Amino acid sequence: MAKSRVLIVGGTGYLGRRMVKACLDQGHTTYVLHRQEVGVDIDKIQMLLSFKEQGAHLVEGSFNDHRSLVEAVKLVDVVICTISGVHIRSHQILLQLKLVEAIEEAGNVKRFLPSEFGMDPARMAHAMEPGRATFDEKMVVRKAIEDAKIPHTYASANCFAGYFLGGLCQFGKIIPSKESVILSGDGNVKGIYVDEYDIATYTIKTMDDPRTLNKTIYIRPPANILSQREVVEIWEKLIGKVLDKSSLSEEDFLALMKGLSHGHQAGLTHYYHVSYEGCLTNFEVEDGVDASKLYPQVNYTTVSEYLKRYL
C-alpha cells in the first residue's frame, strides 16, 4: 500500500519539528506549511529550509487566507496539526477551526490529526480554571471535526519528557538538580512520560492504520508509567547520590497561583491534575487504543535513557 502524503501544520514548533522528522523517517511524502505569519523569524526560516534539505516540500499558506489552506490541503491525504496549546507560549488551539473549514471544503483528506498530544480533553470536563480553557477549546475543535464528518484520530500523549522528566516532575523546572527535589505531596501519584520524538513516531504510525480511525489513541509506554518518587530514584541511581527531599502539599501548591500570570496559572492547574490528582492513570485503556500495544515494534525511550542526557 502506498504511503500517505502528509501536511504538517505547525512544523517549526516544539513538537512539530519532531513530527516532520518522524514523517520523513517513515518514508512519507511530507509537506510543511510555511505560514506567512513567520515573517522574519530567522530561526524558523532556517528550520524550514533544513526540512527542505531533508526532503520535505514547503507549501505557503496562512490561517488568514482560506484559499491558501484549501490548496495546501488538496496536496495531501493526511493533515497533522501541532500548533501550540501552551498558554505561556502561544495558545492557538481555536485557529484549527479554519483548518477544519479548509479540510471540509477540499474534500480529499483521509485523516486529520488535530493538535492534542496531552491529556485527553474528553476526560477533563472537571478541570480547574484557567487551565480548563485548553480542554474546552480542544473539544470545540473535536466537535467541528465530527460535525463535518472528517475522518480523524486524536492522539493523547500524556507528559512531554522535556517538560516533566527534565525537572524531575517539578513545576517550572526543566533541568534536574543533583542536590534536592520537591515532591508533589507524597510523590507517589503516577504519571506517564514520553520522549517527544516517540510521540511523533507513534502518531505517524496511527494515520494510515484503519484500527485508529475516528478513535482516541493513548501513548502510554508501559515502562514510563511512574510516580515522581520512582523518577527521582532513577535519577539518583544515575548520579550515584541521594537527593534531599521536601514535600509540597496540595494546598500549598494551589496557593502558588496567587499573583501568577494567566498563562502560568493555566500551566499550574494542568500540572495539578497530573501530579496531585493522577488524571493520566486513574482510568483503564483498552488494548485497541493503546499505542504501545498497537505498535510493539517501536523501541521507545525509557525514563532512564532520557535522563542520561543530563549527566
Curated annotation (Swiss-Prot):
NADP(+) binds at residues 10-16, 35, 44, 142. It holds the Pfam family NmrA. The active site is at residue 138. Substrate binds at residue 270. Induction: Transiently induced after wounding and by jasmonic acid (MeJA). After an exposition to UV-light, first transiently induced before fading out. One of its GO terms (biological process) is (+)-pinoresinol catabolic process. Keywords: NADP, Oxidoreductase. Expressed in rhizomes, stems, and leaves. Belongs to the NmrA-type oxidoreductase family. Isoflavone reductase subfamily. Dimer. This is Bifunctional pinoresinol-lariciresinol reductase. It comes from Sinopodophyllum hexandrum. The gene is PLR.
